[in-house]
Amino acid sequence: MLKKRIGISILDCNFGNLEEELGELKRNGVTNIHLDVMDTTFVKNITFGPCIINRILEHDFVFDVHMMVESPLDIIMQIDLERVSLVTIHSEVCDKAGVAEYLRKRNVLFGIALNPETQVDDAEMRSADFVLIMSVKPGFGGQKFQEECLAKVEEVRRYGKMVGIDGGIEMSNIGRITGADYAVVGSGYFRSGDRKKFLRDITDEFLCGSCSG
């Protein structure tokens, strides 16, 4: 994840036809998939557990896993990390050091996610490989992008960390986040009438916008 990338969150895909959705993502040129893991303990929603995660990981993508759970290590230990480049947990979660140690022993990057109301913390920034700035309240797709969260990008940059932004990203605001390394796009992609064109356009804007800026 050293190069700038768009990652597609499958939170808003058709889970009743997941295999076809993943196949279409591949045909449309998607390289990175963002897996949102929820179990109702940290956010009031539920997605999928280790069994389904491992089936998804059999597909040929670069995966990052966003753990919106209170006890991430319980799930992480059941995941096939050979196919995972990055795991992100939330700032509010306990035992971040234990999670970081477990991941790094397996050559997986350790990320910290910051909710819209969560401030940048010096100790956390120094411990993380990657910081995911949430531009919506975590737990549900389709929310409006909170532009005030962009101020955190420069704060995190001072620590020399890779920065991602997650939530409400569409063509109308992608140009505002070109200072990030990773943009997580979900509902904007899946609700598009022409998904392949949407992906091409939003990727071009994200990459070319950073070149001109």
Swiss-Prot record:
Molecular function terms, GO-annotated: D-ribulose-phosphate 3-epimerase activity; metal ion binding
Pathway annotation: Carbohydrate degradation; pentose phosphate pathway; D-xylulose 5-phosphate from D-ribulose 5-phosphate (non-oxidative stage): step 1/1
Name used for this protein in its record: Ribulose-phosphate 3-epimerase
Residues annotated as catalytic: D36, D166
Co-factor binding details: Binds 1 divalent metal cation per subunit. Active with Co(2+), Fe(2+), Mn(2+) and Zn(2+).
Function: Catalyzes the reversible epimerization of D-ribulose 5-phosphate to D-xylulose 5-phosphate.
Residue numbers binding a divalent metal cation: H34, D36, H66, D166
Gene Ontology biological process terms, A to Z: carbohydrate metabolic process; pentose-phosphate shunt
EC number of the protein: 5.1.3.1
InterPro entries: Aldolase_TIM, Ribul_P_3_epim, Ribul_P_3_epim-like, RibuloseP-bd_barrel
Residues where substrate binds: S9, H66, G139, F140, G141, G142, D166, G167, G168, G186, S187
Organism of this sequence: Encephalitozoon cuniculi (strain GB-M1) (Microsporidian parasite)
